[in-house]
Amino acid sequence: MTSEDVLAVFKEAGALLEGHFILSSGRRSSVFLQKALVFSRPDLSEKLCKALAARLAADFGKIDVVAGPAVGGIIPGYELARHLGARAIFAERVDGQLQFRRGFSIAAGERVLIAEDIVTTGLSFRETVEALAKLPGEVVGGACIIDRSGGRADVGCKLISLAQVNFPDYAPDDLPPELQKIEAIKPGSRGLA
């Protein structure tokens, strides 16, 4: 599956939006990937995650646990775990810090893959790496459906994406004239979970 194929799935779901958007990082963009619309469709979720899982075995070998941050890593983490024959767990925010709760555990020696839907700056990924550092498993790498950074984000481990895109984004005080004319909306989820 190519990056163009992945974007076609987002278009099919009505999830490739154009306008003026405030990204979770605070940066601005004329393109937003509303992944909730994709992951509301089990057929599309399975299609994307099955293709991503097929890429992972050669790089990471056997995976015991797939761990992702809430909210964005829950569905792709579950779907990847299903295709990899692994368990799926997720971290959630407690007092602003990601923690693994709800009885989730990782045993010494278990190989852990971090899963996320879309990576832009890598912040949620790095926070998940930090939360996993408190547990005895071994983080072998990470996976995401779309790497919006075009491979530039520092995620704290090796990252394999199903697609890489490089949509321009801007600091709020350095917008191009065409975005300055459009009211900004914030469709993301950071701060909600």
Swiss-Prot record:
<dbReference type="GO" id="GO:0000287">
    <property type="term" value="F:magnesium ion binding"/>
</dbReference>
<keyword id="KW-0328">Glycosyltransferase</keyword>
<feature type="binding site">
    <location>
        <position position="148"/>
    </location>
    <ligand>
        <name>orotate</name>
    </ligand>
</feature>
<dbReference type="Pfam" id="PF00156">
    <property type="entry name" value="Pribosyltran"/>
</dbReference>
<comment type="similarity">
    <text>Belongs to the purine/pyrimidine phosphoribosyltransferase family. PyrE subfamily.</text>
</comment>
<keyword id="KW-0665">Pyrimidine biosynthesis</keyword>
<comment type="subunit">
    <text>Homodimer.</text>
</comment>
<dbReference type="InterPro" id="IPR000836">
    <property type="entry name" value="PRibTrfase_dom"/>
</dbReference>
<dbReference type="GO" id="GO:0019856">
    <property type="term" value="P:pyrimidine nucleobase biosynthetic process"/>
</dbReference>
<protein>
    <recommendedName>
        <fullName>Orotate phosphoribosyltransferase</fullName>
        <ecNumber>2.4.2.10</ecNumber>
    </recommendedName>
</protein>
<feature type="binding site">
    <location>
        <position position="120"/>
    </location>
    <ligand>
        <name>orotate</name>
    </ligand>
</feature>
<keyword id="KW-0808">Transferase</keyword>
<dbReference type="InterPro" id="IPR029057">
    <property type="entry name" value="PRTase-like"/>
</dbReference>
<comment type="function">
    <text>Catalyzes the transfer of a ribosyl phosphate group from 5-phosphoribose 1-diphosphate to orotate, leading to the formation of orotidine monophosphate (OMP).</text>
</comment>
<dbReference type="GO" id="GO:0004588">
    <property type="term" value="F:orotate phosphoribosyltransferase activity"/>
</dbReference>
<dbReference type="InterPro" id="IPR023031">
    <property type="entry name" value="OPRT"/>
</dbReference>
<comment type="pathway">
    <text>Pyrimidine metabolism; UMP biosynthesis via de novo pathway; UMP from orotate: step 1/2.</text>
</comment>
<feature type="binding site">
    <location>
        <begin position="116"/>
        <end position="124"/>
    </location>
    <ligand>
        <name>5-phospho-alpha-D-ribose 1-diphosphate</name>
    </ligand>
</feature>
<dbReference type="GO" id="GO:0044205">
    <property type="term" value="P:'de novo' UMP biosynthetic process"/>
</dbReference>
<keyword id="KW-0460">Magnesium</keyword>
<dbReference type="InterPro" id="IPR006273">
    <property type="entry name" value="Orotate_PRibTrfase_bac"/>
</dbReference>
